[in-house]
Amino acid sequence: MTTSSPVRRAVGILRLAAGLVLAVALVFQIVEKVVNNDMIAEEYFSYFTIQASMVTIVVLLVGGFVALRLPVDTAPYTIARMSVVTYSVVTAVVYNALLRGIPDEGFVVTPWPGEIMHVWITVYLVLDWLFAPGRPALRWTALRIVIIYPLAWVAFTLVRGALTAWYPYPFLEPATGWLSVAAYVVGIAAFIVAVASLAIAYSQWRRPRSEEPMEPERIAQPTAT
């Protein structure tokens, strides 16, 4: 059975390190908010950034072990990886374009965990997608998977907001007008589809000529020697 190349093993170590750094940033922010009596768990864990960061930690740690053991990523893992790349890029753009600079209410958290979650982990994930070896090409059917979680999150957030009068982001507040809310939701959804489409197209463009794009249910098998 073919094992991982030295480059793949280096990629695995980098993924593990990135996952641990993101985990440290998230835990630090949680502990800081708890210590300063600023933690409202049901609100904190309702933020898209926080949920996506937790998923990203799992994907990076799993991907690290996959890269250390296998010469090629599996198709299901690659779809999960493409999804977190998409979510991270969209989160970074939305945060830096719409939310950066908005004053915090109450306790002001230490900034570096937020910078890791909204900037640096995105840079790493994009570079990993562009240059890490062992990524199978994905079919366009993978596109429908990446949009499921964001749509479910929006639906949950709007229903929860209607019941509690709390919304995690200003552009989702009905006080700005439902037309405005709808415009932001549709615009961000379109951006998610666009980013995911670019990621899938890149995976197909960079695949070896002999390799066919993989369906979500197919798993890449190591090559026998």
Report each predicted region and the residues it spans.
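Interfacial segments of alpha-helical transmembrane regions
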Residues: 72-86, 142-147
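Alpha-helical transmembrane segments of multi-pass membrane proteins
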Residues: 18-34
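Alpha-helical transmembrane segments in multipass membrane proteins, preferentially the mid-helix core
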Residues: 122-138
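Non-cytosolic membrane-interface motifs at loop->transmembrane helix junctions
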Residues: 39-47, 76-79, 103-116, 140-143, ...
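Membrane-interface transmembrane-helix boundary segments in multi-pass integral membrane proteins
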Residues: 45-46, 164-198, 219
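Juxtamembrane "helix-exit" motif on the non-cytosolic side of transmembrane helices
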Residues: 29-38, 96-105
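Short, highly charged, low-complexity non-transmembrane loops/tails of multi-pass membrane proteins
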Residues: 206-225
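N-terminal membrane topogenic signal
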Residues: 2-18
